[in-house]
């Protein structure tokens, strides 16, 4: 190539040229640091802005430290080597300008992507947005490349001006002090975050993903090793209060209004943690199978996640499970429970596990005094007995809401089948004491149960049908008896109760991500989630997984991973909007 001249890379002239290019590169990098900080300031208007002064100050410190480090790192990785390789200074500056223009444009594009999807740019997100199959969407995003000529012009002008004024610029002494200051902000960013992570200071830890290529330092293992941190207590506190990077939640979006309720049915909601989608049959649960013949059975129903908390978020909040940590950390109340109390429903809450799942005491029933069961060890039998006593004590003219939380634990299929028989008998007793003529009965599961051998991390991210497809029986006089094969999930149950029973007048988007289950139309797709993955499930069981970093996988109905470069554009655009809609901005 002409711009890489042959000959030896030695001699005084060569060293002087390289020295001048390196000196110019420092000033050009400084210029781009300012540009990056200016563009990066836009994230302040996108993120969940912290409430505390320390949180606000950390944003500005991290803004300066993060972008100054990343720009200078790119200079060292790309521009600095070019100083030695490319001998022609015009070609060298031209390549540097082009590279800087591309990076600056991508940063500007990332702010737009983050604003819409709360995701930073990745190969999967890029393929979704710059998609020739959707010309209109492509045109929308191409608008963000319109400033590229302006950015290129600014880079060219500064490149030429700084090269011509280099001798004058080299006499400036303040650049060294500025460099030390920016280096200090970078170090402070990581040290402050490590402190906040260790002491659970959420106004700072919630800013973990503010910027692209952001990987703040943590020091839990170091502090635990040297006795400054109790690892077990720390993990338990996280489980109770939600992950540290959880955002604030805006739920419901608007104040809910209701039409007058002419008839208040009793409501019995039963969840059996670990009940698989194929459990209700004459062979495994004959009594419940008999009850199913007089109920509406939803055969293609999914939980909103793969844990108890995740399923309960869908049932009681109508949201997908990626809001779990936000609900825990903000102690967000369920509008369903609030409405039940406002309508003077008698509440009966019974748990075989003493409400051990954090969502119960941290948020869902936080305003309700729950029994501790200190004298007798709670189990399925005692929970059902307490439920039956509660139902018998109710007056016929006073509506009640009863929630029965049962647990199904088994290590292998044979243990599972034996436990099913016990659960079947207990549910039969509960239904016998229930006045069905005036009661809406819902029986489902927070999530299923898998017998596959997996470690903890694999189990947390497992979304096979045995784990997230669950049975659903609804006994309700206004529903047709029989099997419904349409796709549904737990958020649809919540929406049905709010719309059909309590006659909320707001549109669903104000308070729920589900559809009305009782419309019986079925969903085009449903969403299951955990703190990392969002899983789109289609009626045929096909799953599309995308995580918070833009990684993507596709699975068939048997949970066998398929080769796929890109998920369906329309579905994922809707899914992205759903996963961020109720986060406060």
Curated annotation (Swiss-Prot):
InterPro entries tied to this protein: Alkaline_phosphatase_core_sf, Sulfatase_N, YejM-like, YejM_N
GO cellular component annotations of the record: plasma membrane
Gene3D superfamilies, alphabetized: Alkaline Phosphatase, subunit A
Protein family (similarity comment): To E.coli YejM.
Name of protein: Uncharacterized protein HI_0841
Species, as recorded: Haemophilus influenzae (strain ATCC 51907 / DSM 11121 / KW20 / Rd)
């Amino acid at each position: 190539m002409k711009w890489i001249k042959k000959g030896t890379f030695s001699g005084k002239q060569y060293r002087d040229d390289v020295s001048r290019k390196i000196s110019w590169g420092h000033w050009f990098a400084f210029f781009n640091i300012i540009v990056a900080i200016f563009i990066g300031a836009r994230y302040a208007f996108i993120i969940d802005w912290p409430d505390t002064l320390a949180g606000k100050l950390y944003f500005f410190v991290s803004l300066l430290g993060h972008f100054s480090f990343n720009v200078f790192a790119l200079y060292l990785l790309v521009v600095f080597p070019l100083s030695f390789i490319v001998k022609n200074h015009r070609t060298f500056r031209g390549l540097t300008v082009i590279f800087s223009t591309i990076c600056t444009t991508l940063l500007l594009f990332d702010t737009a992507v983050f604003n819409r999807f709360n995701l930073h740019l990745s190969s999967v997100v890029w393929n979704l947005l710059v998609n020739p199959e959707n010309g209109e969407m492509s045109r929308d995003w191409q608008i963000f490349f319109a400033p590229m000529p302006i950015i290129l012009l600014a880079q060219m002008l500064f490149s030429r001006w700084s090269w011509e004024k280099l001798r004058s610029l080299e006499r400036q002494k303040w650049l060294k002090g500025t460099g030390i200051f920016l280096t200090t902000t970078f170090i402070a960013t990581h040290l402050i975050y490590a402190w906040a992570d260790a002491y659970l200071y959420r106004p700072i830890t919630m800013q973990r993903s503010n910027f692209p290529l952001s990987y703040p330092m943590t020091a839990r293992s170091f502090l635990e090793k040297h006795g400054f941190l109790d690892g077990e207590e720390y993990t338990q506190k996280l489980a109770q209060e939600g992950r540290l990077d959880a955002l604030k939640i805006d739920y419901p979006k608007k104040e809910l209004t209701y039409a007058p309720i002419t008839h208040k049915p009793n409501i019995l909601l039963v969840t059996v943690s670990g009940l698989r989608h194929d459990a209700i049959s004459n062979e495994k649960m004959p009594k419940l199978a008999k009850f199913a013949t007089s109920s509406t059975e939803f055969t293609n129903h999914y939980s909103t996640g793969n844990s108890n908390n995740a399923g309960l978020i869908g049932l009681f909040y109508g949201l997908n499970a990626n809001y779990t940590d936000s609900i825990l950390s903000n102690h967000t109340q369920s509008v369903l429970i609030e409405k039940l109390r406002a309508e003077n429903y008698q509440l009966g809450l019974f748990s075989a596990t003493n409400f051990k799942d954090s969502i119960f005491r941290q948020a869902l029933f936080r305003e309700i005094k729950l029994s501790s069961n200190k004298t007798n060890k709670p189990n399925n039998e005692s929970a059902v007995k307490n439920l039956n006593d509660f139902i018998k004590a109710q007056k016929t003219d006073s509506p009640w809401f009863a929630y029965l939380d049962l647990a199904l634990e088994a290590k292998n299929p044979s243990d599972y089948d034996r436990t099913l028989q016990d659960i079947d008998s207990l549910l039969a007793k509960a239904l016998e004491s229930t006045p069905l003529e005036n009661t809406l009965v819902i029986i489902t599961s927070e999530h299923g149960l898998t017998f596959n051998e997996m470690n903890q991390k694999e189990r947390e991210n497992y979304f096979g049908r045995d784990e997230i497809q669950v049975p659903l029986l609804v006994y309700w006089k206004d529903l047709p008896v029989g099997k419904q094969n349409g796709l549904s999930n737990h958020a649809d149950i919540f929406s049905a109760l709010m719309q059909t029973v309590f006659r909320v007048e707001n549109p669903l988007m104000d308070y729920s991500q589900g559809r009305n289950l009782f419309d019986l139309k079925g969903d085009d797709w449903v969403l299951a989630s955990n703190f990392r993955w969002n899983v789109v499930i289609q009626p045929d069981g096909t799953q599309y997984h995308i995580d918070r970093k833009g990684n993507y996988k596709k699975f068939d109905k048997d949970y066998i991973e398929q080769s796929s470069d890109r998920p369906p554009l329309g579905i994922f655009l809707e899914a992205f909007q759903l996963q961020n809609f109720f986060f406060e901005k």
